[in-house]
Design a protein with these regions (language model features):
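Patatin-like phospholipase
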Residues: 1-46, 56-383
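Catalytic nucleophile serine of serine hydrolases
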Residues: 49
Length: 383
């Protein structure tokens, strides 16, 4: 009888945030990856926000359950709008996703316990908003949780905190920290995959969001309802404030604080995501250029021949070996990278009265993620 060949796990998967669009497209992306020859080689998944949820189910090899869950999911089962009077104290939405996950997929802590035993290590990123001081280092305000080293209960809290869109809901407790959506600090955790010594290939999905403009229609409806009571001084003052907000919106300015929070989050997410890819790309190019330079210098010196040439070549080689710079121990890692918007189909959680999510639209987004990776795998001749 022949021996069973053990496949080395040397592939990392990186998943960005992206709300419901991101989960659905990542689901298709992961389904195609699972059907490929690369899947048995996957040893690590790194996910932020929506990528934390889809990555967790992929690491557990429960993508079919995730698909069923997502096809049933509706906006009010993720983030349910609060009454207007509760906004100043509780945020714009109630975070319903934890209860929905527990009802349909099982206790999240139970999933985290299974995750600790899974052959694929899952790592999620959350943003630390605890009320204490942080250092000014590279990972300030970033919380990173691995299924290999984090207690299951804390890991469960981290997955839900990473997916808690802070423009909508209040932060959550993760162990002894207060945390929220990881997209604020690292929406696309590519650097963590590069830092894993065993990784020889990275397969990544980055969702490119199109942020819908937050209008003032809700404010207009509220103002018209209040205008039936114009003689009451507090109501009259509120009507004037609403008119001012509508005018700000008409000028392209933030009409209210949720609009401001969304705009700030858009800036933070776009900036840290682009920077993440730029640093990875520049590092790979620098490492390749350095290796080429090393070879060229060695060839030039050795072309002189003789003992002197050999002596100088050894001295130069020793100098290269003793050089010290930030990414000396790093190496260029090939990457199969999918980037995409939701296309013509986009499902978002609006601030008020969101439109129901249709199964047809969801299946289209799943197909889009599947087909995008399928095209790239074909180009790379990966079965």
């Amino acid at each position: 009888m022949g021996r069973t060949r053990v496949v080395e796990r040397d592939v990392a998967v990186v998943l960005s945030g992206g709300a419901v669009n991101g989960v659905l497209m990542e689901l298709g992306f992961l389904q195609r990856l699972r059907a490929s020859a690369l899947w048995p080689r996957v040893g690590w998944i790194y996910g932020t926000s929506s990528g934390a949820l889809s990555g967790t189910m992929a690491a557990l090899d429960r993508l079919d359950e995730l698909e069923e869950f997502m096809l049933q999911l509706q906006p009010e089962e993720t983030f349910r709008p609060h009454s207007l009077w509760r906004l100043p104290l509780l945020g714009s939405h109630d975070y319903r996703l934890p209860e929905t996950v527990a009802d349909r997929l099982g206790d999240i802590a139970g999933l985290a316990r299974l995750l600790a035993e899974a052959p694929i290590e899952m790592t999620v990123v959350a943003t630390d908003v605890s009320d204490d001081e942080h250092g000014a280092g590279q990972h300030a305000y970033e919380l990173v949780y691995s299924s290999r080293t984090t207690p299951p209960e804390t890991m469960a809290q981290a997955i839900l905190a990473s997916a808690a869109i802070s423009a909508l809901v209040l932060p959550r407790r993760v162990g002894d920290r207060i945390a929220t959506d990881g997209a604020w600090v690292r929406n696309f955790p590519l650097a963590h995959a590069y830092e894993q010594p065993g990784v020889e290939l990275i397969v990544s999905f980055r969702y490119l969001p199109r942020y819908p403009r937050i209008g003032t229609e809700g404010l207009q409806r509220l103002r018209r309802r209040l205008e039936r009571f114009p003689k009451l001084p507090p109501i009259r003052a509120l009507i004037n404030e609403l008119r001012d907000a509508e005018e700000r919106g008409a000028r392209g300015e933030p009409a209210h604080w949720p609009d401001m929070i969304v705009r700030l989050m858009r800036v933070a997410i776009q900036q840290n995501t682009v920077l993440e890819e730029r640093v990875a790309r520049d590092k790979d190019e620098a490492l390749r250029a350095l290796e080429a330079l090393r070879g060229d210098v060695d060839a030039i010196i050795r072309s002189e021949g003789g003992r002197r040439g050999a002596r100088v070549a050894r001295a130069v080689e020793e100098r290269f070996a003793s050089a010290s710079f930030p990414f000396l121990g790093d190496r260029a890692i090939p990457r199969i990278a999918v980037q995409s918007t939701a296309g013509e189909v986009s499902l978002e959680t609006g601030l008020r009265n969101p439109t129901p999510w249709t199964e047809e639209a969801k299946r289209e987004l799943i197909r889009r993620g599947y087909d995008l990776l399928d095209d790239l795998l074909a180009e790379e001749a990966v079965a």
